[in-house]
Amino acid sequence: MSVYIHMGVRMRRSLTMALSLIIVAPQVSAEALRAGAAQSVITPELPTEHAVYLAGFGHNRVASGVHDDLYARCLALEIATPTLVVCSVDLIGLFYDDVLTIRRAFQQKAPAASFLVVASTHTHAGPDTLGLYGPKPLATGIDGRYLDWVDGRIASTAADAVRAMQPALLKLGRDDHPLLELLQGVDRPPRVKDPFLFTMRLVARSTGETIATLVNWSAHPEVLGRKNTQITSDYPHWVRAYVEKQLGGMALFFSGSIGKVSPLGDQVALLDPETGKLAEDESWRKAELLGTEIGRLAQRSLQNAEQVNLNSLTVQSEIVFVPMQNSHFRAAAAAGVFVGRKPLYSGGKLDPAKEKRDLPDLGRVEYATGHDIQTEVDYVRLGAAGTTVAEILTIPGEIYPELVNGGMARYPGADYPEAPFEPVLREQLKTTYQFIFGLGNDEIGYLIPKAEWDEQPPWLMNAAQSWYGEINSLGPDAAGSVLGALVSLIRPY
């Protein structure tokens, strides 16, 4: 048994700099697989002496109550020595620096564990953990005490999952049912979706009882809309509730390729069997129906699940420096909106420099001048009998589906109409079970194909107004930086 760890610095096209980490478990007996699960509530206390700003729809949306609790849910997988823990948290997102803080605390609590992934579901009805949704522009919405508590809570939950590990069997599921695509709305061209649903069920070897079921699907958790002021995990709440009722154990939900994919609007029409009418948009009933349907399809995917005698686990990780090309984010960084949790770098080193600049819609403001932000991508391979049987990619933001499934297009009005297309992720993957963990270990915003980037008029397809997306992206080179790093991890295998 050996673990190979390599860390180095190198230059490559589209990346400023990269650090790589490889953790390998060689093939061992199939009986060596162990799994454990744990969960904890991370809902902020209400009422409180100060406002809890809700994230996702703009400024000054203050929480008025709690509909359902927010959770950190963690699954630990171990083959021989390497232990991988994946955590899904009901938050709009966590910055990479928070994840590094969580990892340090986790290592103290579970020093033998090898690697931790923390992915946010991206609920639009949870507390602002990014700072962008405070009382007004350039005023943070982060409650530092709450966020520090959440970081510690996630670390403890991950360690609890490790302590709960027991001999386990792994079952893998996938569903391509046409309904999955109908439950996703896309307004921006090209109207490409990522409808695939992937599941992973861990069963106790001794009893046959479910330890945990992992569900991976793609749509923004924003069914309740901007008028809602109650804290909720949105439709993933009902996904998990259905799966746990049917299969037992703990359910985890991971958002996938959610860039520009929404369940809001007329594209996603859900018939309420109790009334015989369509569920109203931005309603609790629509959230319940959507989540329950995804839960049902998740259970369906496992009816003929492939039981895998897992005997190898490999984690590859790379730190990536992505150019910061968003003026609003630079102003936010300089104003303290990110409260120091998303610093800028130049040449791979922290760069706190800032200057005064005039911005069209903000006036004269402080402006951070560092070149890049630091983030991470991961590639996990699960193997059996010398063959990779399942793969996990972490995406540090909200990736447009055409970057995952293909279908990138060139339209009149694009700012970079001749830009080369980025590599398509699923074309690089080898297995039937291709898990995409969006907002994995970071939230850097939308990842948009450069050839479709449209920040200046004329707009794509001669639209009368700008398309939504660019305002919440690091810039036109972000997708290429992230996908270039991922492909470099995948291709050798």
PLM region spans:
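Repetitive helical segments and hydrophobic/amphipathic motifs
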Residues: 21-22, 131
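N-terminal signal peptide c-region/cleavage motif recognized by signal peptidases
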Residues: 25-27
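Non-catalytic substrate/cofactor recognition surfaces at enzyme active-site rims
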Residues: 31-493
